[in-house]
Amino acid sequence: MNKFDEFIESNEKDLDVDTSTRNSIISMSPVRKTGRKIRSASSNGYRLEHHRTSSAGSMHSQRLMTPTRLNDQDHPLQAKPDARRVVTRHSSVSVPNAMSKRRSLIQPMVVPTTPESQNNLPSVSHSEGSYGIPLESTTVLSSEQAMASGLRRSRNGSSQSVNSMIATTIPTNGVDVSALLQSLATKELELLECKQKIEDLKKQTQHEEQNYTRRARELHELKEQVSKHLDPSLNTPVKNRAFSPVYQNIPLESRTENAGNSSLPSSVSKPKNMGHQSTNQSRSVSPQDIQERRQRDDSSDSSKQSLWSKPLALFNQFDKIIQHEIERTLNWDDSLSGTPEVQEGTPTSNSESSAQQYDNEAPGARQKSPSQGSVSRSLWSFVSDVKAGLLGIEEENDNDVITDNRCDPVYKSDRQHEQKKSTHKITNRGQAEDSGDDSSLNNEEI
């Protein structure tokens, strides 16, 4: 043993203090070296093994965590002869009271004990534990007494409740009035609740109908807006449709055809333009467009017959003019029979241009050879006829009546001038035939 250990032990004995609990360990191996067991003399009753080892030895040890009892006399709760007996009330006394309250509605089936039997029961019971330690009861009433008191109270409570029920349920003529009144009140409440539910459902249906009508109106407005965005011509009036982008995309020829002022070449291209318009406008169709199309179809049906008859008449005129000019160039026809045919085959435009050309020609040009004059005149008349047919000077629509009336005096004056010239030529030819001069005939032909 070291001097340090001896010094500690001597101080512990003098001060009556045990400081070995901080380093108390218990051996886990069977091999033990020199050591010393110290039994505490204090009143705490714990067994402590204080084992000290040298620095040279190695030893597996474990700290003692649980106290151990040494004997019955060292127990801290042991009753001493000079100590005063203290009786305390245990907390388990309130448990039977709670149990009695819970069992108050149940009628007891066990007969409670009498006070005589309660006096015979011991008030305090002593028992010894398995370890020889005397266990003192700290309760004033035992569990049997608590149960008996609880049963007695529950019996009293149940009897009182039965008496109260009997007093309140006194039958009157064999009918329970309170039960009837209660059922009547419940039925009235149920009826009121049903009426309230019906009114709520009616209000809800009205509200839903209003929402439905409002949403249907909004849907109709949205459809109109979408149709206006897709077809902007519906927004503009009829007068301003000429400036709309849809109307600007339509060719000028188709516009004149729809308006009634159509020429011959535009009439030929009308079916194609109508097909393009139908494909472009097939995406957005409205009742107004359908009515307008029907009106246009009805108005155009009458003009289609005359439009298709013009090309045939024009081709016939070209054929006659070409045939007549070829015959004149080859001198196959007579001079007398040729001039009326030319006047009958050519249109008014040809006669007008020939008359103007005849008046404007210089005197020296009239003295040319008859063959050159006839060829040039025939060529100029052919060009003027083709030009007049391509430009569509002849107008047959009702919208151009005013222009036709304005042009009638001019045509009349030209025709009168032509008739005067023809009569003058015929008189000259008659005189020449009578005289037998051929040179005058050639000059007249020129």
UniProtKB/Swiss-Prot annotation:
Residues 179-231 form a coiled coil. One of its GO terms (cellular component) is cytoplasm. InterPro entries: Tda11. The keyword Phosphoprotein applies. Keywords: Coiled coil, Cytoplasm, Phosphoprotein. The modification Phosphoserine is found at S244, S286. The keyword Cytoplasm applies. Belongs to the TDA11 family. This is Topoisomerase I damage affected protein 11. The gene is TDA11.
